[in-house]
Amino acid sequence: MCTTETPSLQQLTKLTILPSRSSQLSTPLTFLDKIDHIEINDTSERNGVVFYRIAVFLKHNTSHIPTIKSTAVSDQPDYQIERRFTDFANLRYNVWMYAQRQHDDGRRCKYCGEFMSYIVHSLSQPRALIKLATGVHTRKKLLTSFCNAFIIKALARKEHFRSLCTGYQTIPHIMEDFFRQVE
């Protein structure tokens, strides 16, 4: 009989791995990804200026384990912020500034192209015509659609190829600054 000894295996130990470098994009994307939706249901007027109260509803499902629990969104917003119509127009303009820039290869990436298509073709945006030709109630609806569409477009980057254009890297920061609650 031939007996061969097998070498004893070393006991495996737990190893904690922490990221040594994180993407500058991860913070704004994580923030935007937590937003379920926004609503603009109320306004206030101060010194003749209308402020739109943005109700921000966050996603609360933190577990990745499938359950039969309902992940329904609360009736109450997680926080509210106030913005003027010009703040919405500035958001649109700042996103446009980065999305319309010439890319290295001379063509627009898919990410920036989605924003440009929306900015050029959608009627639900903060434009001068909307401000002058509509009432506050209609503007609330249009601005709600605008904000929710921009959040969806900012997060659509997960589905696109890895782009290194300035719009791809900057637009999420612009969006985060607009929707972040000032403390």
Positions of predicted regions on the chain:
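Intrinsically disordered, low-complexity regulatory regions
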Residues: 1-183
